[in-house]
Amino acid sequence: MASLEMNDLKKIGLGLTGFGVFFTFLGVIFVFDKGLIAMGNILFLAGVTLTIGINPAIQFFTKRQNFKGTISFGLGFLLVVFGWPIFGLLLESYGFLVLFSGFWPTLAVFLQRIPLLGWLLQQPYIRSLLDRYRGRRVPV
């Protein structure tokens, strides 16, 4: 079972993940700059690997139910590197959603604890959507 304490590698991993998201966002803002998007992807993957560990990351990306997401994220990355940033980013987005769809319930619980957002998420329609996915485990 993974340790919940924040050691230095996990802190660095979270920082790299944040920078990866930031660089990808900058790449989209700067008219789909393939260099920034590729750098963001590398930083994101390195950050996820350092945050959860090398072996758990390999197990996560090679699980049978995550295979479709891993392939589409990888092909999207290759499309970005080879000069098709718009199509690559679309394919990466699909892969990201497939890979990390199991984390949405955990994220929803975290967001409900933020003061203004928590009130918004407690509204009946939104709460019924969130309750449907509550109780699932995080897939790591």
From Swiss-Prot:
InterPro entries: Got1, Vesicle_transpt_Got1/SFT2. Keywords: Golgi apparatus, Membrane, Transmembrane, Transmembrane helix. GO terms for biological process: endoplasmic reticulum to Golgi vesicle-mediated transport; retrograde transport, endosome to Golgi. GO terms for cellular component: cytosol; Golgi membrane. It is a multi-pass membrane protein. It is found in: Golgi apparatus membrane. The chain crosses the membrane at residues 12-32, 35-55, 71-91, 96-116. Its main location: Golgi. It comes from the Eukaryota. Homodimer. No interactions with STL1, STL2, CESA1, CESA3, CESA4, CESA6, CESA7 or CESA8. May be involved in fusion of ER-derived transport vesicles with the Golgi complex. Belongs to the GOT1 family. This is Vesicle transport protein GOT1. It comes from Arabidopsis thaliana (Mouse-ear cress). The gene is GOT1.
